[in-house]
Amino acid sequence: MEANTIFVQIASYRDPQLIPTLEDMLEHADNPENLVVCVCWQHSADDEPIEIFLDKGFLPTRYYEDEEMGYNIIVMEKDGATFKIIDLDYNDTEGACWARYQIQRQYDGEKYTLQLDSHHRFVPEWDTKVIEMLESLRSEECPKPLLTAYIPSFDPENDPGARVQVPWKMDFDRFIPEGAVFFRPSAIDHWKDLDKPMASRFYSAHFCFADGIFCEEVPHDPEYFFHGEEISIAVRAYTWGYDLFHPHRIIAWHEYTRKGRTKIWDDHTTPEKNAGKVKLDWVERNNLCHKRNRILFGMDGEDPSQIDFGRFGFGTVRTVRQYEEHAGISFEHRGVQQATLDRLDPPNNVEYEDEEEWKASFARSNDVHVCVHKDAIEVVDDFDFFFVGAHDENGEEIHRKDLGKEEIYKYLNSPNGFIDYRMIFLSAKRPASYTVWPHSESRGWMEKLDFPLDY
């Protein structure tokens, strides 16, 4: 293999930005001949025929069948780069993580790997810059650096004018009810003062650069669907000895809006399943994925030993507890430490003597789905507010955030008639129920509605 070969991984689902992304990658690469790009091309022959490649100068050189999986792979060349296109009807895919795993099966010893989505733009000489950045981190104390981030955004309809020119990092957002951790991007405020990448708690599936062997050591679990992908890879990578970092300079941009793209949840629906076009609908796959993620982390009383995760489990270089200490989150308690909320650089280094002190260092991250149809409420024309509160198992109020008049009637007059939103908050205790209690200017308190939370 060439010394600085890069195995580029791109899972693309019916994305009109795929070809522009590949062209921009090639145009701005310093050494395109070092690129081996594998695309899991989940597409419809009607709106994405092979001509979208041929018309842009991609030259097919070989065509063969993956006998184990039953799909075809088209090998192409352009500008010295090699492309392996996994040709897959969009009805045959099993989700983003499954597609990423199919790509990783094509890894062939390249020195580095870069995982992306199919909607990016790149800085000039991006390949040289990202290699230099990674190698600047390598040492005896850090033998396996990994670069990752929710990279800054661009807009294909206003490009390059709308490109954000500040590098981004990843901050904790919340534990969702199903158990996965969500993140949000934010600017690296002091990026101009940095001469190296900054330490990271988390991993992004749309930008990850590491040694090529990462494809084999921490492969995507094909039984994951979407949510849970990034937090599971973050912890698995950390336990395999990888140290996570955010780039301190921009390498590429990502398109976040999904505008103009058909998504898998638009296609893999219950009617399509009933018609025999897909094996499972996206909701079924999503629920199975969430269950698998909770089992992996032993959340909500799940026993991790009920599944043999094999190569999709944790590594042996570090423990999950060491990751939790680094990141300042607790899977068992769905907890987050203040330093993580304050967006301070990791590791948190919180000292504790025993499990009680460890637990006490966290606030519980809650995401309560409030959902009430107007038919459950006696609707009057002079509501002034709704009490909305969460309670623990003893009925004690642990959070309250009322709805005002404008919000109330916006929901009640909506086409579906649902009061439907998420109540996100921190607390010391676990919420067991929530209450919606309407108040009228003329009638005072009306019927109180209580809803248990099912974990």
Residue ranges and their predicted role:
Residues 2-310:
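Catalytic cores of eukaryotic secretory-pathway lumenal/extracellular enzymes that build
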Residues 159-161, 182-195, 199-209, 261-455:
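Terminal low-complexity segments of carbohydrate-biosynthetic enzymes
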